[in-house]
Amino acid sequence: MQINTIPVNPTLPRHIAIIMDGNGRWAERRSRPRTTGHRAGVKAAMRTVDFCLEKGIKMLTLFAFSSENWNRPADEVNFLMEMSIKLFGRGIEELHRRGVQVRFIGERKRFDIALVEHMTKAEHLTASNQRLILSLAVSYGGRQDITMAARALAQDVAAGRLKPEQIDEDLLGQHMALADLPPPDMFIRTSGVIRISNFLLWQIAYTELWFTDVMWPEFNSTVLQQALDDYASRERRFGLTNAQIASRGKGSIPA
């Protein structure tokens, strides 16, 4: 089954995107190193994967490392890189066994070559899995995403493969990250911060936003269910009127 033809249950999001925020502050409030928070954050991410598999949610996109995170203290960045390599060594096989496809979006060329090799191996190993598509945004920024898409189209115009008047939203969208997936139905951010922080700026134009004060290391199935209950109570309009939504019937929303 092609991913864009998955039937839509209007009370259950197909695709959830999450900013996993609050690891460092969670640790600092407990007088622990920020690295302790990041370790706990990995466990929260795995709990979230478990929840999506249990509920039948087909796509999960996690903001793991932003393009701005390179400006954090060097020891914290180095720890995150080392932890990522260890995670790929232990966790990817388990994700593969459970039918999870792993993808990475972002500027991976900035990472150490060993980490890039782990990313590539993880993608190849899990490429045929369809139970859950897990996209990890690493060294990613929404503005960067749009810039790269615009640059690709500009190169096509310069090469004579494309006319400027042929460029529209659909064509630009085809060059964005996650272009082969439906846009996120629901966006979640933890830690009480109410910002989207340069995450999936293009992709979340009509996404339902949900914020919680819970720090990411404490994020669990109870909080996720609260988010889903809230989502189920909302009416997604996509710019339409109540009458237009009613005439379309349940489940007929843009892919």
Curated annotation (Swiss-Prot):
User: A Gene Ontology MF term for this entry?
Assistant: magnesium ion binding
Cofactor comment text: Binds 2 magnesium ions per subunit.
The EC number of this protein is: 2.5.1.31
> Pfam families, from UniProt?
Prenyltransf (PF01255)
Organism from which the protein derives: Xylella fastidiosa (strain Temecula1 / ATCC 700964)
Oligomeric and partner information: Homodimer.
Q: Please give the name of this protein.
A: Ditrans,polycis-undecaprenyl-diphosphate synthase ((2E,6E)-farnesyl-diphosphate specific)
Q: Which HAMAP family does this chain map to?
A: ISPT
What are the alphabetically sorted keywords of the record? Answer: Cell shape, Cell wall biogenesis/degradation, Magnesium, Metal-binding, Peptidoglycan synthesis, Transferase
Q: Which residues form the active site?
A: 21, 69
